Every structure is written in C-alpha cells, then in structure tokens.
Amino acid sequence: HAINGGGDSNPGYDVILMKKGMLDIQAVGDIFAAPNGQLVFDAMKMADKGHGVLLLTLNYAGDQLAGKQAMKLARKAGLNVRQVVTGEEIRYDPNGEDNKRGLAGAVALYHIAAAAAREGKTLEEVAEIAQHYADNMASITVKSTDATHPQNGMSFGDLGETDLMEIGAGQHGEGGGVRVPMMSSKDTVATVAEALCKALDLKPGDKTFVMINGCGATTMMEMLVLFKDTVEFLKAKGIEVVASMVGEILTVQEAAGFQMNIAKWDEEMLRLWNTPCRTPAFSKE
C-alpha cells in the first residue's frame, strides 16, 4: 500500500491522489503546513495489510521531518516500511541553491507505483520502481503571478506587479529562480525544455512522459498551447513523447504559470502507466 503526507494548500492535488490506481491514504496537514509525524504514522498503520507500506514524500522541510518521524515510529512498531522522496526540480539559476524541491511529477510516479503494487510486486520491488522513476524525471516551474494565501488573501510576492516571469520559482513561489521579461509560449518552452533535456541527458530515440501542470490560474487553452510547443520541440530533437498529462494538477491559489515535467521512460513504465486508474479528478481505463 502507498501513502503520501503533505500540507493542504494545493487545490486539486488531494482529490487526484485517492482511490483505484493511485494512493491508498493521504495524510493531510493544515493550510501551508505539513502533517505531523504521528498523523503520517497513523496513516501508515491504517494502510498496512501485512504486505508493507511505501511512504512517498515530496522534498520539503516539513514533509521530510514528518516522514522521518513517521518512519521511526513505524519501525519501532514493527511495520515493514520503505520511503521514497521526490525532488525533481532542477536548478535554473546558476547562482541559486540546488534545493531539489518536489513538484507535480510525483503524481505520475504515484500511479506507476500503485500499478506495480496492484500487480503483486513486493514492497522492495515497488520502492525500487518508484525510486527509479524519481531519479529519471525533472521539472521546472514558470510563474507570472504569485499565489495568494486562502486564509487572508495576501500575495506571496510582488511578481504580479511586474512585466516579468520567474523561471524556477518553485511550487508556492518560494523563489530561487531567475526573473526574465515575458516570452511567447514557444520561446518559453524552448528555454525550459532545453534545460530539462540537458538534466535528463535525453538523446534522439529516447521515450518520454510530458506533464504540463497549471499553477492555479492558468487556462486549459494556455496549457494545451504549451504542451503542443513542448511536443514539437522534443520531436525536433528526435525525442518521442509516449504519454502525457495536461491540467491543473498540483496548484496554489491564484498563481499564474505552469510546471513542465519530463520523465525518461522505458517500456515497463509505459506498461504500468497504461493500467486502469480512477480518482475524482483523474481517470484512465
């Protein structure tokens, strides 16, 4: 069984995770706050049916702390547990810190891991598949306006007051990226996709999964234009897109922009991806 723990500040994310073909349990914290370790441990106990539990965690300080506490409690209680941490963000600012934050790419990983578990693979095998996936994906966030806090409406920054966009802004607008003048979709995609291809060492003939995730205030039309430009950019390099996901998946309130996630796939990943999945926000038959 697979579980995840994280703060409750990403509309769309919580509902897309649960039910058939995804996670079994989500341990949810308060708004912009990670759950505590005890809550994550309680979720692990609920998920445990005798075959082990895989804890999937995005690389944020609070989530990591809760995960470590929960893993310690679980081992003390004699549970068979493993943990995989996703941190696929690549550093765009050459002078910035290499934070490796976990972004929307984790959602595809959740389905891959869940599919492997449903096939009856052991906990060790599922954890290995999840870790392999985590090691072969990369993401960048581009923001043009900052998120607002749902409890007080305050903006997290001043990006919306400028004519700039930030490449490498992080999920919640934590910053650490580079602010540049607004560009067209095609030019933005060329900048971002080139960086991701370099990070993954993609070569002609490689198979990839592409996700365009809206940050919260991005229209479907905008996301589809970005996706089209991404597919064309990769095709020109001889890189095949074998699967994709486009939509508002991991968001923050009123943030305009997108995340691009590219994962390097093999036939096993594609086979697992093509298994059924049914959640309130994401279904595959």
Model feature map: region roles:
Residues 1-285:
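N-terminal loops that bind phosphate or other acidic moieties
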